[in-house]
Amino acid sequence: MDLIEITPRDFDVDIALAYATPENFTGAPVYRTAVCYLHRQAAAALREAANAARALDLRLRIFDAFRPTEAQWMLWTHTPDPDFLADPRRGSPHSRGVAVDLTLLDATGAPLPMGTEFDAFTPLSHHGNQDIPAATQHNRLLLLGLMTQAGWDFYRNEWWHYQLFDSRQYPLFGDEALPKPMM
């Protein structure tokens, strides 16, 4: 298995997995255990982005990374919206370990304003939305630049979502494949 655990100490990132708490669009925890995994190639790209952020006196905060296929089904059953969630019958980049949902923190640990909260299923979350303030656009573009220069692709509907290119080439994983189960 090519999934490795992402820890704050090893990657110098902040981890706040939204689906391990009730603070997500379902209103209930989806993960029983807050463990952050990524495919080893995605982990290398995350490390590069984290290093670039650190050079600007910023840090990455991860809201979600690997998502077991069972969790993708739970989210889809709750909100089957193909503009914001991958249909689990096709497979999500998250369930392949090659996607990450994240934001930027300033030097004090405060999140930079991004115009919406994570998982706000609204057009205001789209990259390039002109209905958010210019300073907020700047923050989104800063995140976009850090991630794309590190080898990530973006999803146009979600300012927080990045995935490796050619994500479908990676296999899907369920909870049973993990060294420390999440579900």
Please place each PLM-identified region on the residue numbering.
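Conserved metal-phosphate-binding beta-hairpin within the catalytic cores
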Residues: 162
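Extracytoplasmic cell-surface/polysaccharide-interacting catalytic and binding patches
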Residues: 1-65, 77-157, 165-183
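Segments that shape or occlude catalytic/ligand-binding pockets
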Residues: 68
